[in-house]
């Protein structure tokens, strides 16, 4: 447990030294969200600017008035309002694939990474990151599909028993197992991407194999570290929702914006914290000699016995 705490602290230290990356990604997400929501905002303005019920959405949120606005012919097709948000979400994801190699290189550096090195790492690894993502989607999709089918079968079997609580607990335990398995796969591919970036590995499959071996050797510590950070993120989310309901009045748009954006910023920071912890694990393992290397060193450095 102490080793897990040390690695989590090391990851927090790395992420803290490079907190500008979190801020950059947050601002990029905020800008894309603004443009993505602009189409919906424009269509809503056309109706609310001439509606007596506008105050119920401007100084609060009335679900009935909201759905009434969506159903009015003047609002236009729903796709015209939602498609820009979808495309800007995809654009943010692609930007994350592009810039994450530079972030990982910055995390592994003991000094502030120059801008040209950051962008060089991004450009050199963009296609490798795409290939890693495709491998991740295939493997995680297959595993998640199998686990979901097994869980649904177990829940259906539990429904046929006389124990009324058994289906709920079966679904709860199944969801927890799926979360842990997908977290393990996420760790595996985080290590693979770190290996691609730090070793400048052209063959992505070699980094995937290397990431699998490193994850297997440190599985308990890595999974524990990622789960602890995920629990912290869940606590942040719960605190944000509680503050939203308990502190922010329904009429305060600014208060809701501040609490919501602060929560999203901290959730983004938690994911970067996980990445930094993986980099700390990777660097620690590189610094520590393997068992075979240690045995060879002891053989060649041992004094001769007369």
Residue ranges: model-predicted function:
Residues 90-102, 141-146:
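Mid-bilayer segments of alpha-helical transmembrane spans in multi-pass integral membrane proteins
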């Amino acid at each position: 447990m102490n080793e897990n705490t040390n690695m989590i602290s090391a990851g927090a230290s790395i992420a803290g030294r490079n907190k500008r990356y979190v801020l950059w990604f947050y601002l990029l997400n905020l800008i894309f969200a603004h443009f993505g929501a602009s189409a919906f905002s424009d269509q809503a303005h056309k109706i609310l600017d001439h509606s007596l019920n506008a105050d119920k959405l401007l100084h609060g949120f009335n679900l009935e008035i909201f759905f009434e606005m969506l159903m009015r012919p003047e609002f236009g097709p729903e796709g015209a309002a939602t498609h820009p948000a979808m495309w800007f979400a995809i654009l943010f994801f692609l930007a994350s694939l592009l810039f994450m190699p530079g972030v990982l290189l910055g995390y592994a550096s003991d000094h502030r990474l120059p801008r040209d090195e950051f962008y060089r790492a991004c450009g050199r690894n963009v296609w490798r990151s795409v290939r890693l993502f495709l491998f991740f989607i295939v493997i995680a999709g297959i595993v998640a599909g199998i686990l979901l089918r097994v869980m649904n079968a177990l829940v259906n079997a539990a429904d046929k028993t006389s124990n009324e609580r058994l289906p709920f607990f079966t679904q709860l335990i199944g969801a927890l197992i799926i979360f842990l398995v997908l977290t393990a796969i996420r760790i595996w591919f985080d290590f693979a991407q770190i290996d691609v970036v730090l070793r400048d590995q052209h063959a992505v499959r070699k980094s995937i194999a290397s990431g699998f071996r490193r994850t297997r050797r440190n599985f308990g510590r890595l999974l524990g570290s990622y789960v602890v950070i995920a629990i912290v993120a869940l606590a942040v989310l719960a605190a944000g929702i509680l503050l939203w309901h308990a502190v922010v009045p329904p009429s305060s748009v600014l208060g809701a914006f501040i609490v919501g954006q602060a929560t999203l910023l901290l959730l983004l920071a938690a994911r970067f914290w996980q990445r930094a912890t993986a980099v700390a694990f990777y660097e620690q393992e590189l610094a520590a000699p393997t068992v075979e290397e240690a045995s060879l060193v002891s053989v060649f450095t041992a004094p001769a016995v007369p």
